[in-house]
């Protein structure tokens, strides 16, 4: 028998827990959001995010690894085509857990787990602009130093000429 994870299990056996999480992940990818208890949602989140990361890779090995968990081929197809395309710009945080009112029958803490579909803020563009500005700053002092050297040479010559000029003026007096 496989050793269970630390802490209480969601079901009576590890196999039942794996099947329950696989079924919830399938429902999540089919519908975009599901309502469940808070502990189940917290256990589902890492699994769902890992499966979406595999889907973003998009290769055959990743598809086979996802098929180990999600047995429904149509859901895997949706995951690899639609959901992975939506999450392409996002680097994690693909799901959101929102607590809702306790369940009516037994007052169990309920939650909604859903896929995050809002577009990602344009932080990548800002980072690229900052990187370009940093490169421009590094190049600017080099160009400025060359320009300074070019302008300093005449100043030194002028100082030498000025030093000679007072000496000539003293001789003239």
UniProtKB/Swiss-Prot annotation:
Region feature (Disordered): 136-173
Keywords: Ribonucleoprotein, Ribosomal protein
Family as reported in the entry's similarity comment: Belongs to the bacterial ribosomal protein bL17 family.
Provenance organism: Bifidobacterium longum subsp. infantis (strain ATCC 15697 / DSM 20088 / JCM 1222 / NCTC 11817 / S12)
Protein name (record): Large ribosomal subunit protein bL17
Gene Ontology molecular function: structural constituent of ribosome
Acidic residues: bias regions: 138-149
Top-level taxon: Bacteria
Gene Ontology cellular component annotations, sorted alphabetically: cytosolic large ribosomal subunit
GO-annotated biological processes: translation
UniProt xrefs under SUPFAM superfamilies: Prokaryotic ribosomal protein L17 (SSF64263)
Compositional bias of kind Low complexity: 150-166
Key word Ribonucleoprotein present: yes
Cross-referenced PANTHER family: LARGE RIBOSOMAL SUBUNIT PROTEIN BL17M (PTHR14413:SF16), RIBOSOMAL PROTEIN L17 (PTHR14413)
Subunit structure, as described in the record: Part of the 50S ribosomal subunit. Contacts protein L32.
């Amino acid at each position: 028998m496989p050793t269970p994870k630390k802490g209480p299990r969601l079901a009576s056996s590890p196999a039942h827990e794996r099947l329950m999480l696989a079924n919830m992940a399938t429902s999540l990818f089919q519908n975009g959001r599901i309502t469940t208890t808070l502990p189940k949602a917290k256990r589902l989140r890492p699994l769902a995010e890992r499966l979406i990361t595999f889907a973003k890779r998009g290769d055959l090995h990743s598809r086979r690894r996802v098929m180990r968990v999600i047995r429904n081929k149509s859901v895997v197809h949706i995951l690899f085509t639609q959901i992975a395309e939506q999450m392409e710009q996002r680097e994690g945080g693909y799901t959101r857990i929102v607590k809702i009112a306790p369940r009516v029958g037994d007052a169990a803490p309920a939650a909604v787990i859903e896929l995050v579909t809002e577009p990602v803020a344009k932080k990548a563009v800002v980072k690229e602009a900052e990187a370009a500005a940093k490169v421009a700053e590094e190049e600017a002092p080099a160009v400025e130093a060359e320009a300074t050297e070019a302008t300093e040479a005449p100043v030194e010559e002028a100082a030498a000429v000025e030093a000679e000029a007072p000496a000539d003026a003293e001789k003239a007096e």
